[in-house]
């Protein structure tokens, strides 16, 4: 815990950090968010308040799933923060359906469901496609509230991406057909296998069918399958067990979008000058301490960013500017006279925003 917390709504997300060394007590293989195949990792759970300010961080073994980290956060909030009524905001990986049912008695949650679950609810006629609109809609099923919306901009973006992929695969098939015609001894089976692999990689195999016809690859778009695949483009569904009296649908939507602040903190930890990597440690307690210190630095950076927000300068640029402030020390015998250099220009503004004044007095320090 980094500071005293009085709120009852918290944002929570999980990330991983790969390790270059060996024999770390927490290292293990797991779902690697850094896309580093063959690397062991640690899993990090970050808890922030509703403004995105870090309040606690936990480190888990590298093979820990997102949902398995939730009980630890509940214990933290209940026992350390002494919060009786807890509302936790997390993505859909945090709260699988089975866990939502178990947690309903312990905490309130705001999360989301995937397209597979949405399709199931549509099939069971518990939801209707007409509810997915630019304006937020709400449905309550078995004391769980479902907040629905369709982002038209995202719908157009996905449709455009899919069209670009279809155009790309069409060009690749034409190139492959040209090669087959120019090389009579080349294998059509190999060519078909390569195109199939490309279709799967681009996730077009659900609605594009291919076959060999007279040493030429033919493809056809299954319009019905394409329509089904694109039906939920831009659509999403949030879920919560909060009462309407506690939060309306607009508030639920806004709080879920606030998760981006936690993601920003993770990027700051992993990709900026704070440098959580590389981890030159093996013991569990030291690894956790390393992540904790990095998280405290992230908290300080966030506060500095708030104080310096109207100076049109990044935190790193501000810190670099402050490194020019030095003390002048004059030694006379066994005595030392130290005078702080006065801040001017940008440094004066930076310190002023932090309500820090450098004394003009000359201090005498005697040494023995």
Regions found by a protein language model. Give the residues of each.
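Anion-binding and metal-coordination hotspots
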Residues: 1-368
């Amino acid at each position: 815990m980094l500071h005293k917390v009085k709120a009852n709504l918290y944002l929570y997300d999980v990330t991983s950090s790969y390790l270059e060394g060996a024999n770390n007590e927490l290292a293990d293989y797991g779902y690697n968010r850094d896309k580093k195949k063959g690397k062991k990792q640690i899993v990090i759970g970050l808890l922030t308040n509703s403004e995105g300010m870090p309040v606690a961080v936990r480190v888990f073994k590298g093979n820990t799933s997102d949902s398995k980290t939730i009980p630890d956060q509940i214990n933290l909030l209940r026992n350390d923060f002494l919060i009786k009524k807890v509302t936790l905001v997390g993505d859909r990986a945090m709260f699988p359906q089975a866990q939502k049912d178990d947690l309903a008695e312990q905490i309130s949650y705001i999360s989301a469901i995937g397209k597979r679950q949405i399709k199931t609810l549509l099939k069971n006629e518990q939801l209707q496609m007409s509810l997915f609109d630019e304006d937020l809609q709400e449905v309550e099923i078995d004391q769980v509230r479902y907040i629905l919306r369709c982002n038209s901009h995202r719908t157009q973006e996905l449709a455009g991406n899919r069209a670009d992929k279809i155009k790309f695969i069409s060009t690749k098939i034409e190139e492959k057909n040209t090669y087959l015609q120019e090389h009579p001894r080349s294998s059509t089976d190999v060519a078909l296998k390569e195109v199939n692999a490309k279709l799967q990689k681009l996730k077009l195999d659900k609605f594009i069918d291919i076959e060999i016809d007279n040493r030429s690859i033919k493809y056809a778009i299954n319009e019905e399958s394409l329509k089904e695949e694109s039906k939920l483009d831009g659509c999403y569904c949030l879920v919560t067990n909060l009462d309407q009296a506690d939060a309306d649908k607009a508030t639920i939507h806004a709080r879920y979008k606030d998760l981006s602040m936690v993601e920003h903190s993770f990027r700051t930890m992993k990709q900026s000058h704070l440098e959580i990597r590389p981890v030159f440690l093996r013991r569990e307690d030291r690894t956790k301490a390393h992540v904790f210190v990095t998280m405290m630095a992230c908290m300080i950076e966030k506060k500095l960013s708030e104080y310096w927000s109207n100076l049109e300068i990044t935190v790193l640029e501000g810190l670099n500017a402050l490194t020019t402030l030095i003390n002048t020390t004059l030694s006379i015998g066994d005595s030392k006279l130290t005078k702080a250099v006065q801040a001017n220009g940008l440094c004066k503004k930076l310190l002023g925003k932090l309500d820090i004044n450098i004394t003009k007095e000359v201090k005498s320090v005697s040494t023995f």
